[in-house]
């Protein structure tokens, strides 16, 4: 018994599929229809085994035959049988489809995770806001009357320094000085210095 050390190459044999592929390369529509009829079940089967989804498999099989129509001239009969060439195209296209779908799914997951706003605890936010307001009101009580009035008019009613000085009938420089001192006092009281 002799061991085979080299792969055995079968002599080149022309088949009906070889002839059909050559005719398809010349844009023969009837030859394309015949090639499709003879090979579609095996090509579709290969694609379905990879994709496991009938809808995607049908679409991918259609893409494969479009590729066959466009590139039948690139088939080299010396490299393998027409069926091997078709099944190689089918397998590659199906694997490409799987990779494409996985990449799209990952992009959607990343987008979804990035675009979801973190949950907001409205109760906690309300409690914090009420506590901050209470602290500010308590600290405002530690200011002089002129400081407190000037800050209330400027920050709560939105008046300018000039408008505050007119409303309180006080010099503009005095108002600015009292507000600066009042804000410094609030910062100290609130522990923000």
Curated annotation (Swiss-Prot):
Answer yes or no on keyword Oxidoreductase: no
The record ties this protein, via CDD domains, to: Sigma70_r4
Source superkingdom:
Bacteria
Q: Region annotation Sigma-70 factor domain-2: residue ranges?
A: 35-101
Q: Where is this motif: Polymerase core binding?
A: 59-62
A GO MF term: sigma factor activity
Query: DNA-binding region spans which residues?
Result: 161-180
Q: State how it assembles.
A: Interacts transiently with the RNA polymerase catalytic core formed by RpoA, RpoB, RpoC and RpoZ (2 alpha, 1 beta, 1 beta' and 1 omega subunit) to form the RNA polymerase holoenzyme that can initiate transcription. Interacts (via sigma-70 factor domain 4) with anti-sigma-K factor RskA.
Extra information: Extracytoplasmic function (ECF) sigma factors are held in an inactive form by an anti-sigma factor until released by regulated intramembrane proteolysis (RIP). RIP occurs when an extracytoplasmic signal triggers a concerted proteolytic cascade to transmit information and elicit cellular responses. The membrane-spanning anti-sigma factor is first cut extracytoplasmically (site-1 protease, S1P), then within the membrane itself (site-2 protease, S2P, Rip1), while cytoplasmic proteases finish degrading the regulatory protein, liberating SigK.
> What free text does the record give on domains?
The sigma-70 factor domain-2 mediates sequence-specific interaction with the -10 element in promoter DNA, and plays an important role in melting the double-stranded DNA and the formation of the transcription bubble. The sigma-70 factor domain-2 mediates interaction with the RNA polymerase subunits RpoB and RpoC. The sigma-70 factor domain-4 contains a helix-turn-helix (H-T-H) motif that mediates interaction with the -35 element in promoter DNA. The domain also mediates interaction with the RNA polymerase subunit RpoA. Interactions between sigma-70 factor domain-4 and anti-sigma factors prevents interaction of sigma factors with the RNA polymerase catalytic core.
Q: What PANTHER family does the record point to? A: ECF RNA POLYMERASE SIGMA FACTOR SIGK, RNA POLYMERASE ECF-TYPE SIGMA FACTO
Q: Its family?
A: Belongs to the sigma-70 factor family. ECF subfamily.
> What does this protein do, in the record's words?
Sigma factors are initiation factors that promote the attachment of RNA polymerase to specific initiation sites and are then released. Extracytoplasmic function (ECF) sigma factors are held in an inactive form by an anti-sigma factor until released by regulated intramembrane proteolysis.
Question: What is the protein named?
Answer: ECF RNA polymerase sigma factor SigK
Natural source organism: Mycobacterium sp. (strain JLS)
